């Protein structure tokens, strides 16, 4: 594995390898809190869009592995404001670092970066396209909290059009056996046709605008992504469409996930339930990203 750009670039065996390595990294965190396997290595974090969990968990992961971090979170303080192209930026920064993590508003930006970079590139989100490291921590959460991935029924609820975490996770789940996906969204925010075409025939699919979480194993909530709407009047039409309440899940044998940040789609009273796993899901981002950084570094040396 040279880069991590899209879930379409890796297979089931690659995923299982990363999940296995993530278990080892979680054990390292629980036992010692740190490792030195990336001692002397430098991670560059290039965030052209805001981030809290992804950026900080990558920085934490790198430092837990003994490495160092450079980067930016505000492009107004970079040469981007002077007109420097993305490819020039990547060529320069790949000379300063051993690994690059990039988040960018444009679909395809991470792929373009990987084509000119001298070091491995990790996609931390490119527009509404892909978010592969979130997908891997989502899969790790499912495996850790449910015990398996094959044979599960998973309901995705909310913004399935702009939700890159949904696109990546649906594509990854299509690699597993007997998975059923229930896609619940307003008509205006249905999952893109090209994602449906990719997973069609590989999973059992149903689409609806009504919440139905009977007999599902996993509820994956998402926020309506206001920042992706060109017309805010369109956002107002779908804002607050779905809201998961305590009484909806109290007696159900399922887990609730959310890539965060949350707005109002999960009531805060749900947080205390055993079914609520979204904060644990966020924690799992550290061992999973430790695993990704470690494996990319190892594969580069082969």
From Swiss-Prot:
The keyword Translocase does not apply. It comes from Methanococcus vannielii (strain ATCC 35089 / DSM 1224 / JCM 13029 / OCM 148 / SB). Pathway: Pyrimidine metabolism; UMP biosynthesis via de novo pathway; (S)-dihydroorotate from bicarbonate: step 2/3. Belongs to the aspartate/ornithine carbamoyltransferase superfamily. ATCase family. Carbamoyl phosphate binds at residues 53-54, 103, 131, 134, 260-261. It catalyses: carbamoyl phosphate + L-aspartate = N-carbamoyl-L-aspartate + phosphate + H(+). Catalyzes the condensation of carbamoyl phosphate and aspartate to form carbamoyl aspartate and inorganic phosphate, the committed step in the de novo pyrimidine nucleotide biosynthesis pathway. Heterooligomer of catalytic and regulatory chains. One of its GO terms (molecular function) is aspartate carbamoyltransferase activity. L-aspartate binds at residues 82, 164, 223. One of its GO terms (biological process) is amino acid metabolic process. Its EC number is 2.1.3.2. It holds the Pfam family OTCace. This is Aspartate carbamoyltransferase catalytic subunit. Keywords: Pyrimidine biosynthesis, Transferase.
């Amino acid at each position: 594995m040279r880069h991590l750009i899209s879930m379409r670039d890796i297979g089931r065996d690659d995923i299982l390898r990363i999940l296995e390595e993530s278990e080892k990294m979680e054990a390292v965190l629980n036992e010692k809190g740190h490792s030195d396997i990336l001692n002397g290595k430098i991670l560059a974090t290039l965030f052209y869009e805001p981030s809290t969990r992804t950026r900080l968990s990558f920085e934490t992961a790198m430092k837990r592995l003994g490495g160092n971090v450079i980067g930016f979170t505000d492009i107004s303080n970079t040469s981007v404001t002077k007109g420097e192209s993305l490819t020039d930026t990547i060529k320069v920064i790949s000379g300063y670092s051993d690994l690059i993590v990039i988040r960018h508003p444009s679909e395809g930006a991470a792929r373009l970066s990987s084509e000119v970079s001298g070091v491995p590139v990790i996609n931390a989100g490119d527009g509404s396209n892909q978010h592969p490291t979130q997908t891997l921590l989502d899969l790790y959460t499912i495996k850790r909290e449910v015990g398996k991935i094959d044979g599960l029924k998973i309901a995705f609820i909310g913004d399935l059009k702009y939700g890159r975490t949904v696109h990546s996770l649906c594509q990854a789940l299509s690699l597993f056996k007997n998975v059923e996906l229930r896609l619940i969204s307003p008509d205006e925010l249905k999952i893109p046709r090209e994602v449906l075409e990719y997973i069609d025939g590989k999973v059992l699919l149903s689409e609806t605008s009504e919440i139905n979480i009977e007999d599902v194993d996993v509820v994956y909530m998402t926020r309506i992504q206001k920042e992706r709407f060109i017309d805010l009047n369109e956002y107002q039409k779908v804002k607050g469409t779905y809201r998961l309440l305590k009484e909806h899940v109290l007696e159900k044998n399922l887990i609730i996930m959310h890539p965060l940040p949350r707005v109002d789609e999960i009531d805060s009273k749900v947080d205390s339930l055993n079914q609520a796993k979204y904060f644990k899901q966020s924690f799992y981002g550290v061992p999973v990203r430790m695993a990704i950084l470690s494996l990319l570094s190892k594969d580069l040396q082969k």
